[in-house]
């Protein structure tokens, strides 16, 4: 399993915990152990640039996901095939503001955004109410199990 974190944000983040969480999610969703994931931590100007390039929307956002091999969650009988899951870009500065507004630690917000990004890479979405219920329910379940406590509430921009 190749999970890389590249911190270009200038903010100190517990990168090891992001990797541990990602491995946990891979195991729980039966993602192939050799699947690859890249997590890029960027500052607000870099995130705004990515947001414009990828979504044609101005302003920095919290997390962006760029899927590669269209992998989906597997099962115990049929794990996800080996491949490149994709890239997640997270802006710790935006995460810090969202965490403060929600009343939980910034690192919990970083874990929430990492989980959210991975689920997007696996094909989950929240454009429709039913999709949102499924995605956010799984997100809370995974994060609660990982943290051993209630997951932080979503802080959508």
From Swiss-Prot:
- Enzyme class, UniProt record, top EC level: hydrolase
| Keyword field contains Mitochondrion | no
GO molecular-function term, one example from the UniProt record: metalloendopeptidase activity
Example of a GO cellular component annotation carried by this entry = cytoplasm
What keywords would UniProt list here? Answer: Cytoplasm, Endonuclease, Hydrolase, Metal-binding, Nuclease, Ribosome biogenesis, rRNA processing, Zinc
Name the residues that bind Zn(2+).
116, 120, 126
**In the Enzyme Commission scheme, what number(s) does this protein have?**
3.1.-.-
Q: Which InterPro entries match?
A: MetalPrtase_cat_dom_sf_prd, YbeY, YbeY_CS
The protein's location, in the record's own words, is: Cytoplasm
The record's Gene Ontology biological-process terms are:
rRNA processing
Grouped into one coarse class, the protein's main location is cytoplasm
Needed cofactors, names only, are:
Zn(2+)
- Kindly state what the record says about how the cofactor is bound: Binds 1 zinc ion.
Q: Which family does it belong to?
A: Belongs to the endoribonuclease YbeY family.
Describe the task this protein carries out: Single strand-specific metallo-endoribonuclease involved in late-stage 70S ribosome quality control and in maturation of the 3' terminus of the 16S rRNA.
Q: Show the NCBIfam families listed in the entry.
A: rRNA maturation RNase YbeY
Q: What is this protein called?
A: Endoribonuclease YbeY
């Amino acid at each position: 399993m190749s999970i890389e974190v590249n911190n270009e944000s200038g903010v100190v983040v517990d990168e090891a915990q992001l990797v541990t969480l990602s491995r946990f999610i891979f195991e729980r969703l039966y993602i192939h152990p050799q699947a690859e994931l890249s997590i890029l931590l960027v500052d607000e100007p870099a995130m705004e640039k990515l947001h414009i390039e990828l979504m044609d929307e101005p302003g920095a956002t919290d997390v962006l996901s760029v899927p590669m091999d269209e992998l989906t969650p597997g099962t115990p009988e049929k794990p996800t095939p080996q491949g490149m899951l994709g890239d997640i870009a997270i802006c710790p500065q935006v995460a810090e503001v969202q965490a403060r507004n929600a009343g939980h630690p910034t690192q919990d917000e970083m874990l929430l955004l990492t989980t959210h990004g991975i689920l997007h890479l696996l094909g989950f979405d929240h454009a429709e109410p039913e999709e949102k219920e499924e995605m956010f329910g799984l997100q809370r379940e995974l994060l609660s199990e990982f943290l051993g406590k209630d997951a932080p509430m979503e802080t959508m921009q």
